[in-house]
Amino acid sequence: MHLLYQIGLFTCLWLTQYVGAEIDNYDENLVGTWSSKSETVLTGPDFFDPLDEDFFEPELPGISYSFTDDGFFEEAIYIIKSNATKPQCPKGFLQWQHGTYAINDTGTLVLTPFVGDGRQLESDPCTSNFSVYTRYDQVETMEKYEISMDRYHGRYKLELYEWDGTPKQPMFLAYRPPKMLPTSTIAVNTIQTAAKRWTAPLVPLAQKHTNTIWWVGLGLIAIGSIGYLVVS
């Protein structure tokens, strides 16, 4: 019965993605799935499963953004933040959100997530025996973006600049059309199956997730002299 529910829900979500959002200043060059150099982080079902509330940890940190031609976006981020005073205690973050995007007349790119849909998994092996799984949504304003052909890699490159001009790590075109989960909001659909998980702001996740993220801490210990490793 649970399997039939999942199939039906995914079918409905998939069909509703074609009811598109209107977008001004449409840029066909932006459409597609973009991924940082390692290409281990990609949007879509290989990163996050909204039905089972599951993250799938990539082999390496990185970022991925996808954009449709009708105004939807999705992002997948895997970040490792080191602790300068305790190199053996890096924090790992998995973040996923989706929603709509707009391109202003000035070229500013604004990403507005569906409230209640985004998820974050945080792991700190030195302070807790569990990962912490929470809702996550963060409006992102990119001061500008640039798309060019990278001559060295022979691929299209996307560079996003945050609201203050800080560049994110470059991403390269991985898929066109984009590889994404359904673009409709999932918050209403998941509230029944996930109600017990969201009775508190922070909820310990199943131990299975800590086992797969803790290798990050062990790897940094083995390297030894690394002061910090940040992917943002």
Curated annotation (Swiss-Prot):
Signal peptide: 1-21
Endoplasmic reticulum found in the keyword field: yes
Annotated transmembrane regions: 212-232
Lipid bilayer topology: Single-pass type I membrane protein
Gene Ontology cellular-component annotations: endoplasmic reticulum; endoplasmic reticulum membrane
GO term, biological process aspect, one: 'de novo' protein folding
Sugar-bearing residue positions: N83, N104, N129
Molecular function terms, GO-annotated: unfolded protein binding
Subcellular localization(s) per the UniProt record: Endoplasmic reticulum membrane
Residues in compartment: Lumenal: 22-211
Keywords: Endoplasmic reticulum, Glycoprotein, Membrane, Signal, Transmembrane, Transmembrane helix
The UniProt record lists the keyword Manganese: no
Subcellular location, principal: endoplasmic reticulum
Pfam families according to UniProt: Rot1
The family this protein is said to belong to: Belongs to the ROT1 family.
Known function: Required for normal levels of the cell wall 1,6-beta-glucan. Involved in a protein folding machinery chaperoning proteins acting in various physiological processes including cell wall synthesis and lysis of autophagic bodies.
Protein's UniProt name: Protein rot1
